[in-house]
From Swiss-Prot:
Glycans are attached at N12, N17. GO terms for biological process: adenylate cyclase-activating G protein-coupled receptor signaling pathway. This is Adrenocorticotropic hormone receptor. The keyword Ubl conjugation applies. GO terms for cellular component: plasma membrane. Residues 50-58, 127-147, 200-217, 279-297 are cytoplasmic. One of its GO terms (molecular function) is corticotropin receptor activity. Hormone receptor primarily expressed in adrenal cortex that plays a key role in regulating adrenocortical function. Upon corticotropin (ACTH) binding, facilitates the release of adrenal glucocorticoids, including cortisol and corticosterone. In addition, MC2R is required for fetal and neonatal adrenal gland development. Mechanistically, activates adenylate cyclase (cAMP), the MAPK cascade as well as the cAMP-dependent protein kinase A pathway leading to steroidogenic factor 1/NR5A1-mediated transcriptional activation. The gene is MC2R. SUPFAM superfamilies: Family A G protein-coupled receptor-like (SSF81321). Homodimer. Interacts with corticotropin (ACTH). Interacts with MRAP; this interaction targets MC2R to the plasma membrane. Interacts with MRAP2; competing with MRAP for binding to MC2R and impairing the binding of corticotropin (ACTH).
Length: 297
């Protein structure tokens, strides 16, 4: 969504005329380093699940899906930084056909990162709900075949939606659709949490007998969701302000923080793997085995 994702430069030009807020710029090198770190961390998560059979369960497949989403967000920024660098060196034209196509592909990756994160978190939330309240039927309800089918549907939808949003990014309905997915996801998970809370109160004794791992997974989801909201909400607000009030002095003050909001998104990809590792003993054991194996080579 080039006129939105990359709109800060144009908007900030008018912002200086309507607002006293200075544009907050961050060095591209910082974005690049954080993005590289995010790619490597999430790649380690994915490799750990692929190489360890004791991690090949639905919950970890959904975590892999979230890791792929985070990795796409980091790759987006890496490729964008490289494109900007070559453009500044004069190798690319500002509005050439190759540059425009490349820009569309990069923007699609960014949208895939957001959509993939949203639906992966939804899948994890539903998985945790079934784990807690249908523990005895969990393995018959959440099978590997169904997990793969759900993930295939999620990513097919995300790819189709991402391409569509980039093609029609200059239309306001597209922007509204893009931004509405974020609050809709929050409302759905909030309703799920309220239902889980009410069910927990009426089934307190049964829940207290559940394995600690089941509740640990629910707490991990809560932490992941909190980090996701904290890191993405400022950028979603940025998109709305750029679309509906780009010349308002108060809006332009917030829009001037574009780089800070972008930095938060990059940080999300770095923070999530630490949450997985800190909350999951199985992943920590897998990491130790991978490190021991690499030392033996």
């Amino acid at each position: 969504m080039k006129h939105i994702i990359h709109a800060s430069g144009n908007v900030n030009g008018t912002a200086r005329n309507n607002s006293d807020c200075p544009h907050v710029a961050l060095p591209e090198e910082i974005f690049f380093i954080i993005s590289i770190t995010g790619v490597l961390e999430n790649l380690i998560i994915i490799l750990a699940v692929i190489k360890n059979k004791n991690l090949q369960f639905p919950m970890y497949f959904f975590i892999c899906s979230l890791a792929i989403s985070d990795m796409l967000g980091s790759l987006y920024k890496i490729l964008e930084s490289i494109l900007i660098m070559f453009r500044n060196m004069g190798y690319f034209k500002p509005h050439g056909s190759f540059e425009t196509t490349t820009d569309d592909i990069i923007d699609t990756m960014f949208i895939l990162s957001l959509l993939g994160s949203i639906f992966s978190l939804l899948a994890i939330a539903v998985d945790r709900y079934i784990t807690i309240f249908h523990a005895l039927q969990y393995h018959s309800i959440v099978t590997m075949h169904r997990t793969i089918a759900v993930l295939s549907i999620i990513w097919t939808f995300c790819i189709g939606s991402g391409i569509t949003m980039v093609l029609f990014s200059h239309h306001v309905p597209t922007v509204l659709t893009f931004t509405s997915l974020f609050p809709l996801m929050l409302v759905f998970i909030l309703c799920l949490y309220v239902h889980m809370f009410l069910m927990a109160r009426s089934h307190a004794r049964n829940i207290s007998t559940l394995p600690r791992g089941n509740m640990r997974g629910a707490i991990t989801l809560t932490i992941l969701l909190g980090v996701f909201i904290f890191c993405w909400a400022p950028f979603i607000l940025h998109i709305l302000l750029v679309t509906f009030c780009p010349n308002n002095p108060y809006c332009t003050c917030y829009i001037s923080l574009f780089h800070v909001n972008g930095m938060l998104i990059m940080c999300n990809a770095v923070i999530d793997p630490f949450i997985y590792a800190f909350r999951s003993p199985e992943l920590r054991s897998a990491f130790r085995r991978m490190i021991s194996y690499s030392k033996c080579l």
